[in-house]
Amino acid sequence: MPNIADCRVYMPLDGRLHAEIVMAKQRNIAIYGKGGIGKSTTSSNISAALSELGLKVMQIGCDPKSDSTNTLRKGRFIPTVLDSLRSGKRVETKDIIHEGFNGVLCVEAGGPEPGVGCAGRGIITAIELLRQRKVFEEFKPDVVIYDVLGDVVCGGFGIPIREGVAEQVYTVSSSDFMALYAANNLFKGIKKYANSGGALFSGIIANSSNLPIQREIVEDFAASTKTTIAEYVPRSLTVTKCELQGKTVIEGAPDSEQADVYRILAKKILSNKDRYVPAPLDTDQLKDWAESWSDKLLEGRDSPAHVKCELECIIPGAEPILAKPRPQKTPAVKATTPRRTAKAKG
């Protein structure tokens, strides 16, 4: 939960002490992750969970796919900042800010038309427009979540880090190498701009971490890069079901275990004051680290635990069905017939 400095305690006429979360100032949090890793799912559920705590939340999707806030709005897409600007009409605040689940304010930066321009430019333009229109002063959000594509940390995608738009940065990652590779690149960007007012790192959100071996890999990567794990989020069919309905888990399955995972994560983010510079691995170090884990996994590839690991990656909760040894066939014994002896000739 938030520190006591973030709470206000008061006593109304009923004579009982009450407490509510009060943000001293707007919290700006950037959540990065490679495409398809679950950063938008995570961001939207965090936003929904924070809104349950009575906070005013704004989520800004910084991905050309423009689907960051879909599950906060029953699966519906909203006009993006770049689409609104391309229309040629004067852009009003109501054109780019749309209310979602439980009052969460939704914004999508958008991207260029296919084959034209720079995708990162949408983020630059969106943030500039929001500042010009004094959107943050008008709506006074307690928390702003920037959901940012993390495959590359360049140009517009690096703005939340480079210009200190966000005070804290998280990355969503699994134990897959390419997800960790993207996280390592993010760490390089944070380190590069740390001494010039850039955002600092606050933790890895380990997604799809159902098995001990998956956690071990992410934990070892965190130790190798001098970072920390903010929370583990298991893979769950509950997420899939809710997203097919166009909802977050917080809205679609509020009493589920998965919803509680997101609530715990949201509270941890709210109370987390850690801000530090990671120690990214260089190319050779990352290669050596990956090869060491490859050797470990190959050593145990024939074990039942490894088979279960492979199945779990496809079907959470699956159990390996090991082939039973076939019973040995006993060779058939041919019946022997007594030889007839030739009769002696008289």
Predicted segments with their positions:
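C-terminal lobe/tail of nucleotide-utilizing enzymes
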Residues: 1-4, 18-21, 192-346
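Residue-level signature of catalytic and energy-coupling elements of molecular machines
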Residues: 35, 107, 126, 147, ...
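Nucleotide-state-sensitive switch-loop elements of NTP-binding domains
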Residues: 26-29, 52, 65-148, 152-153
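Conserved beta-strand scaffold positions in the cores of enzyme catalytic domains, especially
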Residues: 28, 59, 104-106, 229-232
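Conserved catalytic-core segment of NTP-binding enzymes
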Residues: 132, 136-138, 143, 148-232, ...
